[in-house]
């Protein structure tokens, strides 16, 4: 029998959870984009909607939003830092003119506060980025033939599932199997590439008898029932080759409870809890939460089986979390379930055209209808150049995708209908991909989080970090830290003492763009024993993408009911691009400039490396990353091998570092070794190899001059006649911070201009660019770096054909407005000009109302 103390404990858990959900309010962000796919060289325009997770209303405390663009290998290639306004809105753009190769790029967005809950709490969407058209306007959806996964190191999170030709993952309803209790188990079947597999399976007991069956659908998901005796069970599947493969089920607990909430076919929702003998007479609790808000809770005894029913209409729509717990706040069983959100006419942005005919470069006037006082973003696209489906909407992201783990294929399907087929599908989705945005055991106090790993809310701009001592005996608390932030003629400074953990924090007024930052620790003679770190690497690790994200999405057209004026499209004269250019007159070169060091630096631009590059590394940013993390700057060769899994310099003459304490001078040791290398290069030695990339010899090009490396020669020539430039071995970067950038290409033609004769084997060319400065070392106890203020959003521009004649115009996004506002009647007028060839316009409008409703034109 339960006691008063049991009841008090359960009520205490409930009270702590209610208080925690009110105090620790999570945030969500959704990005609405101007298009569904892009071409290299374009801009990607977006509006961000940042809301409270408990109701999707504005009111977040964060004022800093981070938006990142990741290449197909998982590297961040572009980052934006945007200011969130009082409505929770921010807008900006990402430039696609400096990418190295087409492919599927990921955009993710998060606040620093969101990173406390990992990558699953952040926004993510994958876009195809196609090759730039060979001629203006000749858009073809072409992605590089070579797979990025084969030519780029993959820095995304490792796959936790050991892949074979057939894989099965099991998800017991409620979280675990319990011996002696019947329960449902969902499963996911996939192949070695992570693609869904439809298959029929059999559940076998320890003696090989069939005790159950289950089939996976087109999503690879299915469910079967485990009998009360669940020890030694195996699930058997037949693979595509007709061979059977068996998979053991997760180990079962000897004691505990199981939860069952099957998809109902009527207007009710029922769940049941069963427990082993030790739990049947105990007083337990259950709690129902909806997006972080406590909706219902109560105590109960399991007995021979506890049953509870609700009317579906009495429960909140969307994703709900049902938790069964004991008096300590420990979860006994838990699951998510999804209730179909009923559509409403007020959720729709209606678009009517006041233009009857679509003409080249002609004006288009639209009238938008939505809830009065709504604010949303709007895009008009050339339908003939849209090569990808629309992907997730603001509604599907806020109500579903943000509450589960992983990518949801065809997420719009779960918002189509509330029939039995869709209910079963959402039930399987919740069982397989359910993610606990709210960790109930943390909320109840059963398990605590390390406060030192907690990221604060950035309600303004901050500079934070910590002081790290290179010897444990040196103190880090109470050390004065001075900060100087300056740009041009503007500056600000401050000073504070570090706390007991060596941490510091400075707040800044709103600043825009990049500023110089200097941090100095007041440690005087001991400054060589301290490093000053900066917090700015708190983004989530790159996640492994689903193969279903890396393909074109199905089209869901939303074209305007406009008829193209065919006659005008065929007969209207247009100025060509060349006719619009103003050519400068030619000038005679009177004298040649002397080749100075500055001219050499100008000549050794990175355009050659950029032209050939498959892979690019920003060494300055890489150096900052090491310093931000409180690490010593590594040797260039050590960094290169760590950075790329394809690089092998282990058996080369590269200097690879000294063992033990760095009391000796590595520069002197490297100089001796460099002298030995130069002797070997000039002694007539047949072949010196300087590392391999994917098993192929590396040719090193330093500041556009041949430096070292290569493969065996196709023909024999004297050593001194082999290179077409000076051998710059002594100038090669020793430490990472001496290099500026690295470009890698597997094209065998890249090194031809630097070396004669051709190689007898395929080589990989690595272009290394330096700062043209003496070898430099960072001063200990002082950090000279940069501070990124808010990025200034660009302004979307379009021609005004009322002031100019029609001309060739190949805009794919005809119009983008991140801030459309309806009047008191709920109306807004949009006007823009068509391009020269668009015959059908596709539109996209999305937003979130102040009361948390997701609105769109879908």
Predicted regions and their residues:
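Contiguous segments within soluble domain cores/interaction surfaces
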Residues: 7-32, 37-84, 116-117, 283
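Short beta-strand segments within Ig-like beta-sandwich modules, predominantly Fibronectin type-III
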Residues: 81-84, 212-218, 298-303, 494-499, ...
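Internal, hydrophobic beta-strand segments that form the core of beta-sheet-rich folds
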Residues: 47-48, 68, 105-113, 323-324, ...
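Short, surface-exposed beta-strand/strand-loop-strand elements in extracellular ectodomains
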Residues: 201-203
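Ligand-binding face of N-terminal immunoglobulin V-set domains in extracellular IgSF glycoproteins
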Residues: 90-96
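Extended, solvent-exposed regions of the mature portions of secreted/cell-surface glycoproteins
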Residues: 70-71, 77, 220, 284-297, ...
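Beta-propeller domains
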Residues: 195-198, 207-223, 230-234
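Surface-exposed, low-complexity/disordered segments
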Residues: 22-24, 35, 39, 60, ...
